[in-house]
Structure formats: structure tokens, C-alpha cells
């Protein structure tokens, strides 16, 4: 990923800096969910995670969605306790300090984030409905999640959409299908990212 960003910087004279984020769109059962960061930040800090959430929220707004961000973890709102889970919770606190204009909460498991029946067990959760943006704790967990969903099928994966750089850049891997390339071309035409 760092190599790809370096090449993009070389070709476009863009300055990706700390703001670059990879957002991947997942289409399944009539729902659109964005997953981030799928490309850039290997081990993001809580401030990085807040930046990732903000960039992903911008992509969601660009797609006509009202952003609802879940900071994902293996724990829910402090239980069980771990260093990585605390980092996800602190990212939510960073957004509190920034006063952003979209919904967010966490840390929470993916089932709590996406399933309203499970979310009901956490009445203090600030999301008004299922999350449409999942911020993952690290790039590897985001990548594993996407590859798993792709291999199991019944999910259309679009991305990663590189956002936070000076130019529109869309990336396709060497194993991209014709549909993958078409989806990215549509995203480019709609100036998403």
C-alpha cells in the first residue's frame, strides 16, 4: 500500500500525506456498507481512526448516504477490555472533541453495528440505525474481512476507493474482473472519493 501511494505521488505529484484513506464499498442484500481503512493505515492510532471515519463519512455523503460510523472491535462498549478495543473507543472520543456532523459510536462488534435486533441490547448506543460505515482497527482486519466476503460470495465489493488525496484515483488489482473495473469506472465518473 505504501508502495502504491508512492507511485501515485510520483505520477500525479499528489501529496497523500496522513489524509489518504482506502474505503471499500460492500453491496449485499440491498444494503451498502463502507469498510475503512482498507488500503493505507496499517496500525492507526485513535486520531488516525477518527480521520478514517471522517474520510469515510465524506465518501458516504458523496454516495447519498447519511453516515453512521461504527468503530469495530471484538468487544462491545468496554467489555471485554483490551488495548486495541480501548483504542477504538478513544477514536469515538476524538470525534466527540471534534464535533463532527455525522453519527458514530464504538467500540462494538460487527453484529451490533449491523443488526438492529442485536443493537437493541445496547440502548445507550448512539447510532439511530444500522451502521453504514465500519471502521476497522487495522488494515489487516479490513483486508481479511473483504477477502472473506468476496470468497463466500453474494457480496459485490467495490474498491478500494482512495480518498484524501489531491486527485481522483481509482485502483484495481491484477485479479480484478470486468465488473470490478466497471464499478470503479462508475465511481470515477461520479467523482466518488
Language model segments and positions:
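Anion-binding alpha/beta catalytic cores of soluble intermediary-metabolism enzymes, centered on
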Residues: 1-193
Amino acid at each position: 500500500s505504501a508502495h502504491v501511494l508512492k507511485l501515485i505521488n510520483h505520477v500525479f505529484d499528489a501529496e497523500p500525506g496522513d489524509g489518504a484513506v482506502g474505503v471499500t464499498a460492500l453491496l449485499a442484500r440491498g444494503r451498502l456498507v463502507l469498510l475503512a481503512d482498507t488500503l493505507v493505515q496499517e496500525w492507526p492510532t485513535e486520531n488516525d481512526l477518527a480521520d478514517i471515519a471522517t474520510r469515510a463519512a465524506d465518501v458516504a455523503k458523496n454516495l447519498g448516504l447519511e453516515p453512521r460510523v461504527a468503530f469495530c472491535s471484538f468487544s462491545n462498549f468496554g467489555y471485554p477490555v483490551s488495548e486495541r478495543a480501548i483504542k477504538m473507543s478513544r477514536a469515538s472520543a476524538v470525534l466527540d472533541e471534534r464535533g463532527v456532523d455525522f453519527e458514530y459510536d464504538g467500540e462494538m462488534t460487527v453484529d451490533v453495528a449491523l443488526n438492529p435486533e442485536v443493537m437493541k441490547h445496547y440502548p445507550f448506543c448512539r447510532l439511530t440505525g444500522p451502521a453504514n460505515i465500519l471502521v476497522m482497527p487495522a488494515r489487516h482486519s479490513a483486508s481479511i474481512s473483504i477477502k472473506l466476503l468476496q470468497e463466500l460470495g453474494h457480496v459485490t465489493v467495490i474498491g478500494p476507493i482512495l480518498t484524501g488525496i489531491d486527485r481522483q484515483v481509482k485502483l484495481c488489482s491484477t485479479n480484478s474482473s470486468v465488473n470490478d473495473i466497471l464499478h470503479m469506472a462508475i465511481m470515477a465518473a461520479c467523482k466518488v472519493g
